[in-house]
Regions:
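Long, positively charged amphipathic alpha-helical accessory segments at protein N-termini or as interdomain linkers
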Residues: 3-4, 12-30, 42-175
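Glycine- and Gly-Pro-enriched alpha-helical subdomains that act as flexible
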Residues: 35-36, 41-42
Length: 175
């Protein structure tokens, strides 16, 4: 459980922390890219997803963070990414330990420049995307311009800059 006063960008920050943990454990730049709002990709394939559940407990918001990392997938699911081939430089236990340390540090100290760090690792920054609403029927086409301090998507459509708070994005050629 994690306590924080600004829960909005939590899945983005956790994705950033996981990407940083991969680099630090491996000792090299893994190039795990971030996809709004909660996915990590390597070579344009999803290797990790994040889910956040929240509860209100008195005056506190409490969060449960679920992290799924693909370490060993069957060949028939090859459209997903798998970091099992990186196991010599990303041992599972070391990666988990590093992720937990980074999340704990963030919970206690915050992350000052998380927005610019997230945008640097974003795989669709400045690209044309489809922003899909949670009901999957509505969508907007436009250029991904970044995120605001609350982790909301900034999408430049033909006529305006829209702020999108939930849903997902689809990038041509990725998923």
């Amino acid at each position: 459980r994690l306590r924080n006063n600004n829960p909005a960008p939590l899945s983005l920050i956790v994705g950033l922390l996981i990407s940083e943990a991969m680099d630090s454990v491996s000792g090299q730049k893994i190039n795990a890219g971030l996809k709004w709002p909660n996915d990590l990709l390597i070579n344009n394939k999803k290797v990790c997803g994040i889910l956040i559940e929240s509860e209100i407990n008195g005056d506190n918001n409490e969060f449960i963070i679920g992290i799924g990392i693909n370490y060993s997938l069957p060949q028939k699911e090859s459209w997903w990414g798998d970091i099992g081939e990186l196991a010599d430089i990303l041992p599972r236990e070391k990666l988990i330990n590093s992720i937990l340390k980074k999340i704990t540090f963030y919970a206690e100290n915050g992350y000052q420049n998380w927005k610019s760090a997230w945008e640097k690792r974003c795989i669709h920054m400045g690209k044309e995307i489809k922003a899909i609403s949670n009901n999957q029927n509505d969508y907007e086409l436009g250029k991904f311009k970044g995120i605001n301090e609350d982790g909301k998507m900034l999408l430049k459509t033909r006529n305006e800059l829209k702020i999108i708070s939930s849903g997902e994005c689809s990038i041509k050629g990725i998923y």
